[in-house]
Amino acid sequence: MKSKEIRNKWLNFFESKGHLIIPSKSLIPIKDDSLLWINSGVATLKDFFSGKKIPPSKRLTNSQKSIRTNDIENVGKTARHHTFFEMLGNFSIGDYFKKEAINFGFEFIFDVLKFDREKIFFTYFSEDLETLEILKSLNVPDSQIIKGSRKTNFWDMGNGPCGPNLEIFYDRGPKYSNRGIELLKNDIENDRYIEIWNIVFSQFNNDGNGNYELLKQKNIDTGAGLERLACILQDTPTNFETDLFLPIIKEIEKLSIYKYKIDNYFLKDKIQEKINLNFKIISDHLRTAVNAINDGAKPSNNGRGYIIRRLIRRAYRSGIFLGIKGKSFLHKMTQIVRDSLIYDIDVEKVSKIIKKEEEMFSKTISEGINLLKEKIKSKFPKDNSIDIENKSQVAKYFKENNLTFDFSIAFELFSTFGFPVEIIKEILEDEYEIELDISNLPKYLEEHANKSRSENSSAMQKVINSLELVKEKVSEFVGYSTLKTKSKILYLLNETEEIHFTNSENEISYLILDKTPFYATAGGQRHDKGLLIQDKNRIEVLEVFKDKHLNNVHKVKGKILKSELINAEVDSNIRIGLERNHSGTHLVFNALSREFGKEIEQLGSDNNEERLTFDFPLSKKPSWEEIKNVEKRVNEYINMSVDREYIITTLEGAKKLNAVMTLEEQEYMDPNEVRIVNFPKITADLCGGTHIENTKKIETFKIISLDSKGKNKFRIKAITSKKIVEEYLKDEISKNKLVLENLIEKNKSLFQGYKMNFSWSKNLDEQNEQITKHIDQARSDYKKLLKNSENKLEKLESDFSIMKFKNTEIIFDMNLKMASLQSLVATLREKNPKAIVILGSEISKGKFFICVGSKEFSAKDISNIIFEKYKGKGGGNNILSQGSIDKKIEKAEDLFELLKEKGII
């Protein structure tokens, strides 16, 4: 059955049951700060369920486009993980409840889709006896009903509506696993029993403290993955062989030197697995990029745009692995993606955006890979005994010699050649099994930006000084009162001489005008940006700086004729951003002085249109509470709506007025004519920069970081304007929620009953602080849980078999209880990061469940070797893998020899 038919059958069926069909909404949430993307069918209907809006019908159904990107690296490594998917849903808002919802499910599954009754299994919440009775009344055999726990069958976000849920599974048979119903009973990840439908019975309200009351209005919220249903109805090993993905894969094959092999799911050829993986990455990421761009997202360096950029780049790199030639290829498949779906997609627009992103990336990727290989080769012995193309040999050499890849080298490849650090990390870890810690990336980025600014400014100053043509101050700055002016070109220069014209739109030159509205970088404020316009030529102003005579020098790109007048136009949006942040710097200086006293002075500042920094001395590091007091005081100043005043006087006159002045301000100002920027009743400062007309126009002020810059020196980084602060908070909330989710999962690996109760404020600032506190709590809980597990381990460790080879330990035991395996392996893995942990439990006569964990080695590779030797099957990831085997591993020595033979150790 084709995917379009499945989708239509769903919508038509529920329409026949009185449901209103709701068209799929945009992937970009509208007025919902809690989501980066629409990630489920119910996400667009939340206002109906909460009562904020009246639904057009109490019965709704949809097929909703969704994106989830919290686990991008796992795409293609599992049978069903995608970044873009479609969720089929039916919803009742205070109308029908359990009996009708389950009956609808039965009718659709058995009468419409014609599933075999013997292959459908149900899991329910153990305390939900009503659901159990309904299932029995529908003649479901006891053998196909599995009792679930609160963890598996109770939908609860920690605060608000919640309730038990019924999960419906399809059994794909023993060819996907010899193990039977125990997989469902023990909630073991597998490819045999596939969850096709989840029906949530929203009947309780959690007050946030774990107290549950019955809701006055009971609701139904369901979700069925279209890709999963297609996989079953089209009888494919994974979702990637369905008609939603295969046409894209076939199109990729036309460009690749390789072929995608469907049967390799069963054959398990390692080389072909890698080939298939890259086909899957391209097909998945392309679907996401096409749909997200069509809905308004654009590749960029932050938020949604960064995710799209990352997906396109990952797909492009997979294309290189598959031997696809040319600067761009992904954009050619936009139409194929469009044809596999039902949504209106502007193929031309989307294709152009993807092509531009590809071409931009193609300039760095191929050279970057070669440079990366050279950096890896620098670690090899001088006898050239290691082949860089033999990736398993390289991986083994790095492990045996405890070699690492220095992050500073990775950053050098990024800063010098533009090779993205995330791509470097993926190549190292995926292809060479070399870990790369990128946690220091933000710090390196800031240091690199500061260094680049300094070097660039010095280089341009050298250009002007070396010509010795400009003998005095000849240029007037008029930017305090206007952003536009018609000017005469006094000097047109290149790097060696004075010139009369430039020939190319890409030619760089330097201008001094008789008058200019462009502010030059000085006093901690960055230069203005904008255009010079001469006839039809639009000349981009790249940078503005002062020469030794204090003339404003414009570094520009474009065609210019010196003899003609030129229009100078400052970008007003960038100017107002600069003014907000420069005025914000004055206010934060004053607020810091009021909080900490006379010890505060300005050691340095840097303001651009996006943010400000302020460096100051203090004998001890400020507490975050003190920093929040400073932030609060600045916002109070903003809300006072104080008009800015300019006072022109001499340096001596400024001193008599007690104006605040820094050495930097005194150095670049003419002592006979200095400017004081005065915000009455707040602060008066010697300053030549541009400033906001009224404090209210700063809108809002937020401190986003406090860093140490040496002994007793600190730097505040802050942002202004409602738009920038809101975007920052949304981005932080999104990132922090992912961190929190991962921490909760990590804690659950140590204690399955672990959970946290959430209650988020609608205020973004408060919500972000709440999430941060939950992150701190989760980290604290992890330490306690780990300690608790370690205490339990002390009683068991003497029974473990431990073998050591060079720096590698194998920790082994096959006689443990099933329930404790995962937490034991997780604890031992964290406690012994260089060890391979293999623990097992007998689950039936002659059958054993094993769990493998390691931080140094791939747990998945090790478990696959064990499954091959001991007739088993399972799955997992690089740090934790599990499954069953039909033969007991008798002793650690057997494992040691097996892993040594396979080149793991």
UniProtKB/Swiss-Prot annotation:
Per its UniProt record, the required cofactor names are: Zn(2+)
Report the record's Gene Ontology biological process terms: alanyl-tRNA aminoacylation
**EC number(s) reported in the record:** 6.1.1.7
- The primary site where this protein sits is cytoplasm
Where is Zn(2+) annotated to bind? 582, 586, 687, 691
Q: Provide the GO MF annotations for this entry.
A: alanine-tRNA ligase activity; aminoacyl-tRNA deacylase activity; ATP binding; tRNA binding; zinc ion binding
- Entry-linked Gene3D superfamilies: 2.40.30.130, 3.10.310.40, Bira Bifunctional Protein, Domain 2, Threonyl-trna Synthetase, Chain A, domain 2
Q: Which organism is this protein's natural source?
A: Mycoplasma mobile (strain ATCC 43663 / 163K / NCTC 11711)
The family note in this entry says:
Belongs to the class-II aminoacyl-tRNA synthetase family.
Record-annotated disulphide pairs = none
Query: What protein name is recorded for this chain?
Result: Alanine--tRNA ligase
**Reaction catalyzed:** tRNA(Ala) + L-alanine + ATP = L-alanyl-tRNA(Ala) + AMP + diphosphate
List the HAMAP family hit by this protein, alphabetically.
Ala_tRNA_synth_B (MF_00036_B)
One cellular component GO annotation, for this chain's record? cytosol
State how the cofactor is bound: Binds 1 zinc ion per subunit.
